[in-house]
Amino acid sequence: MWFSNLICYRFKQDVSYTQEDFDKALEQDLFRPCTGQELATFGWTKAFGKHGETLSHFSQKSILVCAKREEKVLPASVINELVAEKVDLIEAEENRPVKKKEKDELKENILHTLLPQAFKKSSLQFAFIDQENGWVVVNSGSFNKAEELLALLRKSLGTLPVVPAFANYDLDVFLTDWLTNFSTPEGFAIGSDAELEEADDSGAQVKLKGHDLSCDEVKSHLETGKRVTKLALDWQERVKFMLQNDGSIKRLSYSDTLKEENADIPKEDMAVKLDADFILASEEIKQLLEELTQGLGDIDDLA
């Protein structure tokens, strides 16, 4: 339940769900394994897996959901090799070149033959809805994967009026200003990792890891006009993360003190442990996001 990457959205209006209605909506799009000719499937599964009984998990005005993706593994190199072998055979036997349209048809036929026999791999995608403060937080470092989950949630619920949380902020400006002045909003401290980028079309990058970001070398990069696109931050000495200029929050690392708060719960009570960890992690993330947005300021004031 400890989210490691965050793609965040805000509701455009107040929302309120009951678990009965929410789960009933999710049941319309349950996960099912791939059948013969399907490349992939995507649907809802129990939020706590084998340790839970319901699709969603409601706790502390937050809702945890889990989507499962299954896809068949057909390496492009294998397909291309089989197509090439078939093309060589046709050209040798019929003494004629094989044109692109025919190659495409051969590829489709090979795919059709191999799909039922292909290996399958699966992955889980978690997200939680904060009904109180209007957040949707997806545990992903990819906007495409986050949008895929939101699309499924929107399909199940019928509507999902959300927008990317940080889309209207020019985060380059904030990150560059924070590092230039080595000053951050209250509760946040600058870490030791950053990425800087030339403002011109060259896009030349400087990647700093485990670095003293207050040193003269970094100041020199900033003075020549480089902008900060990624910056490591420490919030309240409880959560460390990398804030990126696209609005994603990556590499979350929770303090030992925080993670040990539920250490007294027996491993045998896994459902209780998962619930306690979800409450702990989601409450920390919600507070972090609220303080981060306060530090960035009201978007209307920045217009």
Curated annotation (Swiss-Prot):
One of its GO terms (molecular function) is double-stranded DNA binding. The lineage of its organism: Bacteria, Pseudomonadati, Pseudomonadota, Gammaproteobacteria, Alteromonadales. GO terms for cellular component: bacterial nucleoid; cytoplasm. It is found in: Cytoplasm, Nucleoid. May be involved in recombination. This is Recombination-associated protein RdgC. Keywords: Cytoplasm, DNA recombination. Its main location: cytoplasm. One of its GO terms (biological process) is regulation of DNA recombination. Belongs to the RdgC family.
